[in-house]
Design a protein with these regions (language model features):
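Conserved AAA+ ATPase core "coupling" helix
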Residues: 123-143
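Short basic (Lys/Arg) and small-residue
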Residues: 116
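Conserved D-loop-proximal element of ABC-family nucleotide-binding domains
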Residues: 75-76
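Walker B catalytic acidic pair
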Residues: 68-70
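Conserved catalytic network of the ASCE P-loop NTPase/AAA+ motor domain
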Residues: 55-59, 84-88
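Conserved P-loop
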Residues: 1-55, 100-111, 121-124, 143-145, ...
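Sensor-1/coupling segment of RecA-like P-loop NTPase cores
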Residues: 85-108
Length: 173
């Protein structure tokens, strides 16, 4: 959007505080300023109470909304984002995981799966070369099979595995 001279609002759930309060980062080190979803929604409910031709935010016309770590959204936040698409005709693109380390849907992911117009999977590959569909939590070289669904800032790590190697507990060759 930026390359095309358009303005995209970057958002993240308040749960995601790993990269600092007002920033999102990629695994390769790219960073961009972002706002918390709930703060944005409070502001727009005040700003956009009328149906205008252009919806402004920070003095700029909003062309799109991008949400990082969308799995951490609440179902209600997902519904509000769908209202932005339907009633304000602003595209909302959400990026995140489908399932947790136990292969259960996150509540935000579940709601996105239920109402999203389009779902595109970005394929990830297991160490064996097969499609990785399991976000595997591990600690001390062993797969973790119990614990809190959301674990930020812990000593545990995550690796993408195919379902077979997840079931077998094989983190690598």
């Amino acid at each position: 959007y930026e390359e095309r001279g358009q303005y995209a609002v970057l958002l993240k759930p308040r749960t995601d505080n790993r990269d600092g309060e007002h920033e999102i980062q990629s695994r390769i080190g790219l960073a961009a300023p972002a706002e918390y979803v709930d703060d944005f929604m409070k502001k727009i409910s005040e700003l956009w109470d009328t149906r205008e031709a252009e919806y402004l935010y920070h003095g700029k016309k909003v062309n799109a909304i991008l949400v990082d770590e969308a799995q951490f959204l609440s179902p209600e936040e997902v519904d509000t984002l769908s209202d932005i698409v339907d009633f304000y005709e602003i595209p909302v693109l959400c990026y995140g995981l489908r399932t947790d380390f136990l292969n259960h849907l996150f509540p935000g992911s579940r709601r996105l799966m239920e109402i999203a117009d389009v779902i595109e999977e970005v394929p990830t590959v297991c160490w064996c070369g097969k499609r990785a569909q399991c976000n595997t939590r591990y600690s001390n070289g062993k797969i973790v099979r119990e614990g809190a669904q959301i674990m930020l800032g812990s000593n545990e790590s995550y690796v993408a595995l195919c379902r077979k190697h997840y079931k077998e507990g094989k983190l690598w060759k």
